[in-house]
């Protein structure tokens, strides 16, 4: 596409050091001081992985709400905040959460319930004063169309590596635009997918923000790039280089392919 311009990004993984005992509120302040203007995190991360949606207690919902309030108080009103609930709630608990966080002006609440149940998701969307978002598990425009036509969310989150590439993601964006729905691509993966997602966001009118893990991934993810697209403050500069604007160092890639271990954040 080769467009010029800038794509705004929201930061994920800024909170990762809480596993080492760091304070979430302090980490939010640090991320903002380093240039982030939009932050996303997982306020129900404390729940056991096996806990079922219907087992979540009101006190656990309140704990998550209190965390949102604390982060908002720390970063002020001008920073966009988003939360990913990772499908941990049923409709009643999700409605309770969305109502209670309304005063804190979240940009969106991601996957509050199982997205496969469109009846529940669209019903929650009608109740919620906060935009809902989903899409990272959907593959192709047909699956997105079902969500979009039901007005089940205010923001869709296609992943360029899951939906089938740039062309398919742009078609999904067109469908969303018809219904007044924004696009905030899911992007926890590597530099090539990031570059592709940036190009799509630069080419569509309903791009909201692009997810980035730029501050929380192993360096090995970028070591095979001879020309890379790096986060600059709160976004990516599209630039004028041909293609995706990045180049792979094939020798480095072959070397890294022999190293064992995980490149996951």
What are these regions (language model features)?
Residues 6, 10-127:
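Metal-dependent enolase-superfamily TIM-barrel catalytic cores that perform enediolate-based chemistry
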Residues 1-7, 229, 236:
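N-terminal amphipathic alpha-helix/helix-capping segment at the start of soluble metabolic enzymes
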Residues 19, 59-63, 164, 189, ...:
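Catalytic cores of large soluble enzymes that bind and process phosphate-bearing ligands
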Residues 219, 224-265:
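C-terminal extensions of enzymes
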């Amino acid at each position: 596409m080769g467009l010029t311009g800038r794509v705004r990004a929201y930061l994920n993984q800024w909170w990762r050091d809480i596993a080492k005992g760091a304070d979430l509120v302090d980490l939010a302040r640090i991320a903002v001081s380093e240039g982030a203007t939009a932050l996303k995190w997982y306020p129900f991360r404390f729940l056991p992985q096996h806990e079922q949606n219907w087992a979540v207690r009101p006190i656990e919902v309140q704990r998550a709400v209190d965390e949102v309030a604390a982060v908002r108080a720390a970063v002020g009103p001008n920073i966009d905040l988003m939360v990913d609930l990772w499908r941990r709630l049923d409709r009643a608990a999700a409605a309770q959460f969305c109502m209670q966080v309304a005063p804190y002006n979240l940009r969106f609440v991601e996957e509050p319930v199982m997205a496969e149940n469109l009846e529940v998701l669209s019903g929650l969307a009608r109740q919620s004063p906060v935009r809902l978002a989903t899409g990272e598990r959907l593959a192709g425009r047909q699956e997105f169309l079902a969500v979009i036509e039901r007005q089940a969310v205010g923001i869709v989150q296609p992943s360029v590596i899951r939906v089938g590439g740039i062309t398919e993601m742009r078609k999904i964006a067109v469908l969303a635009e018809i219904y007044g729905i924004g696009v905030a691509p899911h992007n926890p993966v590597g530099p090539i997918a990031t570059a592709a997602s940036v190009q799509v966001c630069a080419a569509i009118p309903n791009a909201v923000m692009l997810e980035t893990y730029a501050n929380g991934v192993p360096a090995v993810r970028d070591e095979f790039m001879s020309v890379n697209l790096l986060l600059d403050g709160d976004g990516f500069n599209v630039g004028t280089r041909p293609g995706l604007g990045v180049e792979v160092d094939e020798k480095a890639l072959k070397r890294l392919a022999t190293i064992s271990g995980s490149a996951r954040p």
